[in-house]
Amino acid sequence: MIILPAIDLKEGKCIRLYQGDFKASKVVAEDPIEVALKFKENGAEYIHIVDLDGALTGEIKNLSIISSIIKTINIPVELGGGIRNLNTIDMLIGAGIERVILGTAALNNRGLVEEAVKKYDEKIAIGIDAKNEKVAINGWLNVSSINYIDFAKEMEKIGVRNIIFTDISKDGTLKGPNLKQLEKLNESINCNVIASGGIKDIEDLKGIKEMDVYGAIVGKAIYSGNINLNEAIKIINKGSSK
């Protein structure tokens, strides 16, 4: 299982939200490039970045910082937040992003997902952010009536290979992930599932690994010191090729 440390960008700084609430944001680092380098030094093989300004406005706002991170760390980066059209996807993949995450756009525009998957295959991921099992969009400000499992199955039919699942009620809380919903999703589809939201300690990561999930995104637990990234990667990868 791969562990993806998270960088959430707002106005060029690393911040963390609580339950997806932009008003409850806290700056955790002034220099995202320094943070990314530290993640790499601690053994990260992949980094998860969200452009929170982009998620709110519908267009990428922190591209210069993101480009600098890619050039500096030289390990794969996946990016979400404000990606709403194929031109933006083209631009990001051209800039060196390894995997582009579509969230709101995937729910509002199935045609875009089809086009993107046809062109970029596994470089496209779908971010499914759920509240009470319903898919949320527009920076988590709006909750749809669509069930997260139904949506995941629909994305899989289109050809999506990677799904990032976040239970919003758990995100940034350090109260543990929603293992029940995660397991239900992982058993319902054949895509690579990446767990996100609420992971508080190494035991949570072990619980996710037992489900044979592809990956886990860890944010607040690293910044708060609850999880030592280097130790976590070693423990999770011990005796396992996945």
Curated annotation (Swiss-Prot):
Pfam families cross-referenced by the UniProt entry: His_biosynth (PF00977)
Record has Glycoprotein as a keyword: no
Recorded GO CC terms: cytoplasm
Keyword Metal-binding: no
InterPro entries (UniProt xref): Aldolase_TIM, His_biosynth, HisA_bact_arch, Isoase_HisA-like, Isoase_HisA-like_bact, RibuloseP-bd_barrel
Pathway entry: Amino-acid biosynthesis; L-histidine biosynthesis; L-histidine from 5-phospho-alpha-D-ribose 1-diphosphate: step 4/9
SUPFAM superfamilies for this protein: Ribulose-phoshate binding barrel
Any one GO molecular function term: imidazoleglycerol-phosphate synthase activity
EC code: 5.3.1.16
Family from the record: Belongs to the HisA/HisF family.
Protein name: 1-(5-phosphoribosyl)-5-[(5-phosphoribosylamino)methylideneamino] imidazole-4-carboxamide isomerase
